[in-house]
Curated annotation (Swiss-Prot):
Belongs to the universal ribosomal protein uS3 family. Residues 211-253 are annotated as: Disordered. Gene3D superfamilies: 3.30.300.20, Ribosomal protein S3, C-terminal domain. It comes from Ambystoma mexicanum (Axolotl). Residues 233-253 have a biased composition (Pro residues). It is a peripheral membrane protein. Keywords: Apoptosis, Cell cycle, Cell division, Cytoplasm, Cytoskeleton, DNA damage, DNA repair, DNA-binding, Lyase, Membrane, Mitochondrion, Mitochondrion inner membrane, Mitosis, Nucleus, Ribonucleoprotein, Ribosomal protein, RNA-binding, Transcription, Transcription regulation, Translation regulation. Its EC number is 4.2.99.18. One of its GO terms (biological process) is positive regulation of apoptotic signaling pathway. It catalyses: 2'-deoxyribonucleotide-(2'-deoxyribose 5'-phosphate)-2'-deoxyribonucleotide-DNA = a 3'-end 2'-deoxyribonucleotide-(2,3-dehydro-2,3-deoxyribose 5'-phosphate)-DNA + a 5'-end 5'-phospho-2'-deoxyribonucleoside-DNA + H(+). It is found in: Cytoplasm; Nucleus; Nucleus, Nucleolus; Mitochondrion inner membrane. This is Small ribosomal subunit protein uS3. One of its GO terms (molecular function) is structural constituent of ribosome.
Amino acid sequence: MAVQISKKRKFVADGIFKAELNEFLTRELAEDGYSGVEVRVTPTRTEIIILATRTQNVLGEKGRRIRELTAVVQKRFGFPEGSVELYAEKVATRGLCAIAQAESLRYKLLGGLAVRRACYGVLRFIMESGSKGCEVVVSGKLRGQRAKSMKFVDGLMIHSGDPVNYYVDTAVRHVLLRQGVLGIKVKIMLAWDPSGKIGPKKPLPDHVSIVEPKDEILPTTPISEQKGGKPDPQVPQQPPQQPPAMPPPVPTA
């Protein structure tokens, strides 16, 4: 028998489930370019779509790893047998995904690359992917014992208003180095896309679009138009009546 819960408790439970699932997959699939998760609930089963840049690593050899993840999720969250399915979906544009770029920068710093060089490489890749603007902030013990923050900005970036919710993609990651923990924050401003593939369909509120005027076709030959409208082809037209001729003048004596 299904337990009835209020709408408020249902929203809270769904939020906790997605947050815990995201945390688990972030730790488990960090090296495979994990970029987010989508949960779709149907009447018969729950579908979990894992977004990643390297989907082959997520699936594993002959689908072994995805089956292991399915079993762990099913056991942890108490799903009935066969009621949960995990799928792996490749990120269409890796350069426009903030999570993927934050993970990329994290592994560059772990590999010993200089902070400035790593950040400029990520910045350039994001802008070449077609974004409108981006911002990368790295904070912590970058040089010496004094903690500081370095910000790298390119293009246009909005910081306030409702468009931030659907135009700006943000990701925060932490990397543990020998000198301490560094914080990484990546913000990517997407471009307006009417098709909705690489950006939001809704344009910015201050966007002004100028419609090009249509080319006017000028007549090359003079055209005569009837004033009263088109004549009826069934009714024959009467020839115009001539005014009566004036009588010749009478000579006077």
